């Protein structure tokens, strides 16, 4: 990908030496590789249109295939917006641009993680659609679907039946905001495809140029009306004109677009009663001037853009001009109730991008990187729960999402669980006090959206770039089918000595994927032996209907005449039955089977289909496998009686099965055949016949598909065709899953001292869980067995000679197993020979100087005034105070230039209370904090409170100071290796 920077900036950076940034020392905290791949996978579940054959799930299907038909165009494709099914092109185009920005800024990380291909697929899925929406230079279709109609129905995308009108803007009815955002999206797509598919990139550029011109010559949103109340443009269109101009410059190198981008800066919003560019909101679908500002800073190096973006990032991190965005007690930078995590994680992405730019100072880079990690870790679980579906501890299980819920009843309460896991979806997030309810009705905190994940993906890519992680091999969403998709529930309406009347409801509760069926039928089987023995025949039996919701009821039809078995055929062909509401997912029919009048030999007890419904009366019904269901003549539910004739079709007892590759759960799959007079020629996978005796066995009417054969497949959906000598060939669909427990190691962190007097081999115990260790790797390169490490049973020894060759810092070793997620060993490498006790100076102030407060906020600045480095893990700082009412207490590090995750806080109750002190807070540092170099300073901003938020009285505390900026305080004590080096103890 091409990146453009001004010549002046490059020269300046070369002169100042700012190209080198210190590596980040914090611990990884979470598996960013897994989080990244899942966040990208989410977009596959949002796809509209004809889905590709290589899709990685079994619960999404084709949908929205008539989009655009009302205007004579093909407007299929794109993404559904959130938990609904409208295609709003403003947030969609924004989201695609953000994904392209991630590809632009974190290309190496995405390639290394194996996720670039999936990300490019997501980008192109939208850019292809946006091109369709632009049929001529000054016409753009900006929305498909009516938000009000769409929101009035709750069901899966595959079966929606409402009108889906297409809405456009043109010269007479313009929409500069959405058109310019589409231009940005296509220009950004051109940037990432420039070297991969130049022809496609050229197509994107052509459309982007035309769209930009269209937006620029109209400069109006008067025609952008259909999204009103859903995605209004509050910030206007000038921010989009700058944003799109920047991306067109990056795509083309044409400075005309860069000049245009800068020209529109004067029209960006400002803070009230000032001329300062707005900095207190966040980059989002509505306001993209923050991203434009950041890119302009990187491209031009101009101070106006640097100051503006730093003002914004400061406001979100350490505060600007005495103000900071609200922080929840557990550390989320919280802007707004609707999608709070969307704003925090997107700002985290911007912070990471800017921090990694050479024009950002070391001090600012440390602040912004620390902020970014804190916010991403919050989303992944640092508050005690994950906010990403399918990831981490206690993730959301009930997101506000129609297709993932997969209701058949047009109801958020049916079923009372989600049938599908919406892997990777970032939910809206908590309230300003960390409160959150995982409830399907909670669309404020628990809905998901394409724009929620957009900045999140980029931020995760930057986390993976810095801290690594282990993507799950062959991640997929092939789920086990957990309920019957088609079935009949039946009962007895009435019965007499010569008749029975059946009430039957044919159900479609399909979900893997949901689908509209208009060729469903079922059969009710009867035994006419008693009638025939009385001298009658099947032709003497009459079939009538009482209530009928669209079926053609015929019969009796012969099934096995030798055994007097016949059936009533109830055929709903032409009637749509689909999981879309009470009247849609089930159709009722009431039919009567009657022998001649005045006869009394009718016997229900010997009828095949009567088995489960005997005694089921008074309008009640039960599900029964003895009333089999067919889709276009193919058995999809139930069991047929033996000896069938008619169409001479064979059947199998199950048509769906699940095979688990987990060695502890692998089982053969047994299928019972109803041959119906046919013979089994063989079983086919595609056009290839399985090998009898090797892949499967046959014993009588039972076929056993062997686990050795099934285990040869990767996780996927496999269809096995039972090839019979006559009739239709039934298909067994096997969902191949893998719940194998990944291997683990003990420990996952270790220390190594390069000092020869202290160095030791690092020993690791393997917990294979049935997996096999293939290699130990560092940065993708395998260590040499026997030279770098050894294996003895389940113990791996990393040789000290290998570790002694590694630099001081953090080394990450990946244990590469044949299955599951690979565990990682992090080794903190130090060299005690380099460490001598240094001279340290501490300055502090209180972030809160109120007499009474529920939160004490000591801020420290440590400076090494000596000539040798100080290992920070040897340093302890004590702040003395009175607790004023014994309670549990909580500690937070709001920010530190060495990373808040590298700061520890311990509350110590003093054995002998002193005046002004019965407790102290001891602040320490982890190994990841590294060293404090001579003449270097670091900052630590702490905060602590009682668990019940009752007040402290600060004025009588030993260490309390009224300083509001850094100054001396000899009542703060500092220790190095347990030795007091600064301050006076009480």
UniProtKB/Swiss-Prot annotation:
Active-site feature positions = 84 (nucleophile), 400, 438, 447
Q: What class of enzyme is it?
A: hydrolase
Where does the signal sequence lie?
A: 1-25
Record bears the keyword Hydrolase? yes
Positions of the Domain B repeats? 651-738
Among InterPro entries, the record links this protein to: 6-hairpin_glycosidase_sf, 6hp_glycosidase-like_sf, Carbo-bd_X2, CBM2/CBM3_carb-bd_dom_sf, CBM3, CBM3_sf, Glyco_hydro_9, Glyco_hydro_9_Asp/Glu_AS
Per the UniProt entry, the Enzyme Commission number(s) are 3.2.1.4
Q: Which UniProt keywords apply?
A: Carbohydrate metabolism, Cellulose degradation, Glycosidase, Hydrolase, Polysaccharide degradation, Repeat, Signal
Top-level taxonomic group? Bacteria
Enumerate the catalysed reactions.
Answer: Endohydrolysis of (1->4)-beta-D-glucosidic linkages in cellulose, lichenin and cereal beta-D-glucans
**Which segments carry the Domain B' repeats?**
744-831
Name all CBM3 domain ranges. 481-642, 836-986
Could you tell me which PROSITE patterns the record lists for this protein?
CBM3 (PS51172), GH9_1 (PS60032), GH9_2 (PS00592), GH9_3 (PS00698)
Name its GO BP terms in alphabetical order: cellulose catabolic process
GO MF terms here are: cellulase activity; cellulose binding
SMART domains found in the cross-reference section = CBM_3 (SM01067)
The UniProt similarity line reads:
Belongs to the glycosyl hydrolase 9 (cellulase E) family.
Please state what the protein is called.
Answer: Endoglucanase Z
Query: Which source organism does the UniProt entry give?
Result: Thermoclostridium stercorarium (Clostridium stercorarium)
